[in-house]
Amino acid sequence: MELILGSQSSARANLLKEHGIKFEQKALYFDEESLKTTDPREFVYLACKGKLEKAKELLANNCVIVVADSVVSVDNRMQRKAQSKREALEFLKRQNGNEIEVLTCSALISPKLEWLDLSVFRARLKAFDPSEIEKYLESGLWQESAGCVRLEDFHRPYIKSSSKNLSVGLGLNVEGLLGALKLGAKIASL
């Protein structure tokens, strides 16, 4: 059965590739601006549910569709994708030397199974090097990530301690997804 990743995220695509999961990547448009909540957990859940509803429109093809959404929370204040370099700098200032949470809601839908998971990756950060912040902002890489958090490069050397579920921090609960895929295969074979 074909697996479709309903996301344009290169980090999510890389996670699937690293785990040997074959997939096709397709963008699903869901208007996150229509969500009025400022609660990080509620927001990421509703955004993922919205994407899941869009995915249901593609299900006629007898395929498995995976969607996800992530936000960052610092002191329970939500950080989505920064809209400007100034906002990115504000996000990084708030994260500097503090604990961050990356909340990721991952979901899978197939003709016989629907799975949804909300997980949290926590990291305590050291203080950022101001010259590295400037380089990071100039690179533009921050534009791709919720809260400008890039655990795969910029944030990595600043992690003092963290929870074990790095894939959640990178935007997709791969461990949970693998379990759901195995369950889906068992159900399909019945």
UniProtKB/Swiss-Prot annotation:
Catalytic residues as annotated in Swiss-Prot or TrEMBL: D69
Coiled coil regions, renumbered to chain: none
Pfam family, one: Maf
Any one biological process term the GO annotation gives: nucleotide metabolic process
Gene Ontology MF annotations: nucleoside triphosphate diphosphatase activity
InterPro entries named among the record's database cross-references: ITPase-like_fam, Maf-like
Keywords on record: Cytoplasm, Hydrolase, Nucleotide metabolism
EC number: 3.6.1.9
Superkingdom assignment: Bacteria
Enzyme class: hydrolase
Keyword set includes NAD: no
Cellular localization per UniProt: Cytoplasm
Reaction catalysed by this enzyme: a ribonucleoside 5'-triphosphate + H2O = a ribonucleoside 5'-phosphate + diphosphate + H(+); a 2'-deoxyribonucleoside 5'-triphosphate + H2O = a 2'-deoxyribonucleoside 5'-phosphate + diphosphate + H(+)
Cofactor(s) the protein needs: a divalent metal cation
A cellular component annotation (GO) from this entry: cytoplasm
Family: Belongs to the Maf family.
Function: Nucleoside triphosphate pyrophosphatase. May have a dual role in cell division arrest and in preventing the incorporation of modified nucleotides into cellular nucleic acids.
Protein name: Nucleoside triphosphate pyrophosphatase
